[in-house]
Amino acid sequence: MDTLNYEVLAKSGYNGYILKNAPEKVLQFGEGNFLRAFVDYWFDLANEKADWNGKCVLVQPIAPGLAKMINEQEGLYTLYLRGSENGKKVDDKRVISSVSRCLNPYEEEGFKQMMDVAASDDLEIIVSNTTEAGIVYDPACKLEDVPASSFPGKLTQVLYHRYKAGKKGILMLACELIDNNGKELLKCVNQYIDQWGLDDGFRKYVNEDCTFCGSLVDRIVPGRIRDPKEVAELEQKHGYADPLLDVGEVFGVWVIEGDTKLNDVLPFRKAGLESRVFVTPDMSPYKKRKVRILNGAHTGFVLGAYLAGFDIVRDCMHDATVLGYMNKMLLDEVVPILPLDQEDCKRFAAAVQDRFNNPFVNHELMSISLNSTSKWRARNMPSFLEYVGKNGKLPTCLTMSFAAYIAFYSNDVQELTDKGLVCKRAKGNEYTVSDDRWVLEFYNEHKNDDVPTLVHAVMTNEQMWGQDLTKVPGFEEATVKNLTNIRENGALAAYASCL
């Protein structure tokens, strides 16, 4: 079977949108599954729907990478967006043609090509997703390195070369999953300007002529298909082999923080994508929306659902009690206190149900349960406290979620091992709670406590919550009642009592 390239694609009879040649307007640090299923997908749509006429040059940010494979396929790859949308199964295929090539800067020729792109009149945008560990300042990096080992070091080299070539400033879009990603990246570049003794003109160029934007990315990307049988079936169906085939969920939102005038610079509004990719002066409410609704829903229902006998997220969405509990928590307790358009938040919450119901992804509850102490504190506790502050009463489902958290960490504790705290659920099987060691030691020490004693010990542990939760009126009494309900009647019955 021939591997995908433009000639092979033409022979296969593919009749979707393809753009073979266009100016290279984007330099992208990162060539992995996520960026190719997300950023390059949006630019591909912009080419089709807005006649943007641009290509992305990818750069592998570390020595081992996909440059050779991507170049053998002339930048082409197949993307499947799979999931559930408005309750219906979706399985959409698209061949992405927004990528021109991929450079390996760890080879001398690849480094030279990266610098040639840096000095190009066509270049407008630099995008990055170099993982959470990518935006770091490494003082060992030098200007003359080929290349600098850190991503901010490479970016400083690229920008300095562009500055020396007398080219206009660029728009920098950071996608790394850290707080203030754009600001942190700019901070690192300024550190290299100091360390390398670069001139004040370049400092002005970076800080005034270039625009560093943070962004929030939201799409689950499982990546390649691992089932050899399905891969073989798709190759027969496509008429070509594609080792770069990528899979993402249907849902996708890219929130870029910056001056809204950038909506006129970027091609996405013109392409009719403004509900999916947009610029806002402050993305913190959107981050709050994602953390409180999407992540908060997970932590809010998963622990009790696991105790009730469920193992994957999708099955929970098919149970009327768990689904009803999750929706009540989101729509009655979380959404109303968010500082965003309420209808927009309700649509986001409805999309969460579709995402959790994805027929192509088996998302295990136990994988979500990792570090649930810090997760409940970051994702659920702010909604809980804000609800109490606004309404002067306890939110029913969020209050229950705290009891479910304690139940999960204390259900028939067997032993504390190197791997975690071994407990047992009503279904009969053992499970291992994973969290910081001190948290697990705490629950192991309190495994023989009665319910009121355990609840009081957990709620007064300020290392866990940053405060004494017994000071929230009625919370301790409600948690004792809820935990007793879970232990005596089961988590599903306890969830049902909230409806």
What are these regions (language model features)?
Residues 1-499:
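Substrate/ligand-engaging "lid" and interaction regions
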